[in-house]
């Protein structure tokens, strides 16, 4: 098993090196939707085949919120693809196809397909196209898509009519991706929520009062349904945490989640799952099984190297 894991790791590293050293692909970060839209056009618009897309964007909590929503969907005997970044151990972790990960051979085949378009892309754009062309071939109920650093010109912002767009906590984490004269929290907020769809359901996660006020100003003209985090709360009773809204109270029975931020992300996902008509009893049974690998995770075995 150890030998197999080393082989997979070697294959993953090899694929990353192939992308990094590719003459057509660029290692730098360059936000622009023109390139990826041209590739998608040349590939006959596979993004239009993705039904029920849910975008996850923001600064902190995209993966944990997405993973929780995916866990609830799958516990409800439904299926979902998922695109996440970054991967923790293997490149294929980025591409979930509703029951399995994309394998290394399929990733290589997808790269060859993209090469034929002869359009220069950034590596993140390549990874996004790999996800889209493979997700388009899957018959699933939902497609869960995690954005990169920002959203305005992020390569995941290519779906015309997403089912929902989930905004997690926004902070100064991505200031370094902004122009020199625009490195402000206000600009981060604008880049993330100022370009959301007018034809979807927007969910806003827990924010500081300042960020929340700025988000509301940015969304003032947005025509979408908007659900803010004041519609639910995380409460503690008798040493137990609960999700609570006007209709439901759900016990957060978990030994795997070790921070208030992650608990709030879980609650945000519970709200979304309830709106997707997933029953309370299914959510309650699923919560103890949810783990966030590499996120405030206690390691009880294996060697830790200094």
Question: What is each residue range found by the language model?
Answer:
Residues 24-28, 175, 304-306:
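Acidic/glycine-enriched edge-of-secondary-structure segments
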Residues 8, 29, 33, 40-41, ...:
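ATP-dependent carboxylate-amine ligase catalytic core
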């Amino acid at each position: 098993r150890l030998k197999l894991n080393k082989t997979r790791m070697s294959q993953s590293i090899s694929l990353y090196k192939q992308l990094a050293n590719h003459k057509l692909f660029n290692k730098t970060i360059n936000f622009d939707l023109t390139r990826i839209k041209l590739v998608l056009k040349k590939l006959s618009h596979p993004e239009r085949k993705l039904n029920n897309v849910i975008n996850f964007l923001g600064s902190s909590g995209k993966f944990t919120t997405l993973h929780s929503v995916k866990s609830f969907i799958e516990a409800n005997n439904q299926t979902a693809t998922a695109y996440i970044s970054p991967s923790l151990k293997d490149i294929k972790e980025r591409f979930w196809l509703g029951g399995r990960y994309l394998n290394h051979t399929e990733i290589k085949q997808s790269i060859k397909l993209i090469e034929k378009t002869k359009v220069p892309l950034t590596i993140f754009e390549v990874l996004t196209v790999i996800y889209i062309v493979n997700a388009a071939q899957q018959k699933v109920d939902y497609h869960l898509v995690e954005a990169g650093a920002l959203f305005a010109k992020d390569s995941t912002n290519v779906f015309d009519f997403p089912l929902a767009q989930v905004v997690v906590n926004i902070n100064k984490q991505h200031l370094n991706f902004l122009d020199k004269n625009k490195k402000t929290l206000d600009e981060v907020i604008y880049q993330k929520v100022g370009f959301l769809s007018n034809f979807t359901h927007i969910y806003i996660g827990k924010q500081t009062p300042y960020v929340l006020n700025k988000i509301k100003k940015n969304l003032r003209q947005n025509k979408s349904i908007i659900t803010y985090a004041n519609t639910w709360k995380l409460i503690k009773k008798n040493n137990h945490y609960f999700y609570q809204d006007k209709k439901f109270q759900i016990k957060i029975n978990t030994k795997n989640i070790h921070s208030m931020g992650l608990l709030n992300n879980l609650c945000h996902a519970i709200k979304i799952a309830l709106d997707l008509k997933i029953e309370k009893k299914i959510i309650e049974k699923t919560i103890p099984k949810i783990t966030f690998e590499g996120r405030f995770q206690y390691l009880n075995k294996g060697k830790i190297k200094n």
